[in-house]
Amino acid sequence: MKFVDEAVVKVQAGDGGSGVVSFWREKFITKGGPDGGDGGDGGDVYIQADENLNTLIDYRFQRFYEAERGENGRGGNCTGKRGKDITLRVPVGTRAVDIHTNEIVAEVAEHGKKVMVAKGGWHGLGNTRFKSSVNRAPRQRTLGTKGEIREIRLELLLLADVGMLGLPNAGKSTFIRAVSAAKPKVADYPFTTLIPSLGVVSVVPEKSFVVADIPGLIEGAADGAGLGIRFLKHLERCRVLLHMIDIMPIDQSDPIQNALTIIDELEQYSEKLAGKPRWLVFNKTDLMPEEEANEKIQEILDALGWEDEYFKISAINRNGTKELCYKLADFMENLPREEEEVAEEDKVNFMWDDYHKDAIAGKDVITEEDDDDWDDCDDEDDDGHVVYVRD
C-alpha cells in the first residue's frame, strides 16, 4: 500500500436541533401549560488512533466528513434526539492541525486514544424553559446553533526510538539494512530513499529498538528544498538521533561542510529537534587506510568542536555496527522516555458557549411575533398538542 503521511480534510460537526413552542391541549383542558421540548445537540467529530493502520491514503480520496444534525424538540416535553458522532480512524502517531491557524487541534500517540476535532452545535430551548411566575404561557424558544466546521491537515509522525539523518548517499539506508530486516532501496545516486522506512533492531531478545530512516537532507531543506524537510517531522518523537557522515563522499564534497549543513538545517527546522541527544556516525571508513580515516575523522571533530559520542563504521561491511547497536540499546535503557506533557484538552473556541445562558436572559430568543410561520390557536382547539414550529 502506498505510504501517505499527510492529507487535508474538511470536517463539519452536526447542527443543534431547535426548541419548539407547544402547549398542552386535551379534552376539558383548553389552556394547558407550555410543553415545548428542547432540541438535540449536534454530533461531534473525533479522530481515533488505530494500530492496524499505517497510512493516511484513505483520506486522499474522501475529503469531507459530516456528523449528524440534532433533531428538533417536540410537544409533550419531548427532547430531540442527539446527532450521531463521527469518528475518523487514523494511524497511531497522527496529529490534526488547523490549516488556517496552524494550531494543533488533536494528537493521538497511543492505540485507542480518541480526541474531538469539531464540536457539535448546542440544542435550542423549548418554550417550557421560559415559564415563570409572571409568564405562564411563554411563546419564546431558541434555535439550535451551527456545528463547528474545520479544515484540518492530518499528519502522520512515525514512532521510532532512533532517527537517522544526513546528506543523500551518506549510507543511512545501508546501515538500516545491515542492522535490521528492513530492506530500503540502496543505489549510488542521490535521493534513492523517497519515503521513510522503519527497522526493528534486536540486540538480544529482551532488548530491541526501532530505527527510522528518512530521505537525505540538502542545503536549504528548512526552506523546502529537496525531500528531507517533508519528513523531518518523523524524527520529532525519536529519543536519539544518528547523524551519518560520509568521510569520503562520491561527489568529492567537503565532509566538514556537509556536517555543518545538516546541523544548520536541523536548527532552522526546530530547536526542540536540534536539542535531542545526537551521535555522530562516520561511515565508509573502509574506503581509506585506517590511519588516514582517523586523521580525517579527528579533523571533522575539531572543526565541529564535538565532544560527545561518535562512532566509526562501515555499513556495507557491517564493521562497527554491532557495537553501535549495543551502545544504543544501553543508552535508551538508561534514558527515561520523555514524559508527554499532560495538559488539559484545549477548550474548543466555540461561539455558542454561552448560548443557553443568554437565551434565558432574553437574548437570542425567537418569539412567535418574530416567526412568520406561527399561527395562533383559538381557545376552541382542545384536541391534542398545538405545536408552533419554524421551518
Swiss-Prot record:
User: What residue stretches are annotated with the OBG-type G domain?
Assistant: 160-333
Gene3D superfamilies xrefs? GTP1/OBG domain, P-loop containing nucleotide triphosphate hydrolases
How would you summarize the oligomeric state and partners of this protein? Monomer.
Top-level taxon? Bacteria
Could you say which residues bind Mg(2+) here? Answer: 173, 193
What is this protein's name? GTPase Obg/CgtA
Q: Which residues form the Obg domain?
A: 1-159
PANTHER family associated with the record = DEVELOPMENTALLY REGULATED GTP-BINDING PROTEIN-RELATED (PTHR11702), MITOCHONDRIAL RIBOSOME-ASSOCIATED GTPASE 2 (PTHR11702:SF31)
Gene Ontology terms, MF aspect = GTP binding; GTPase activity; magnesium ion binding
| Enzyme Commission number, as recorded | 3.6.5.-
Protein's organism: Vibrio harveyi
Requisite cofactors: Mg(2+)
**What are the top taxonomic ranks of the organism?**
Bacteria, Pseudomonadati, Pseudomonadota, Gammaproteobacteria, Vibrionales
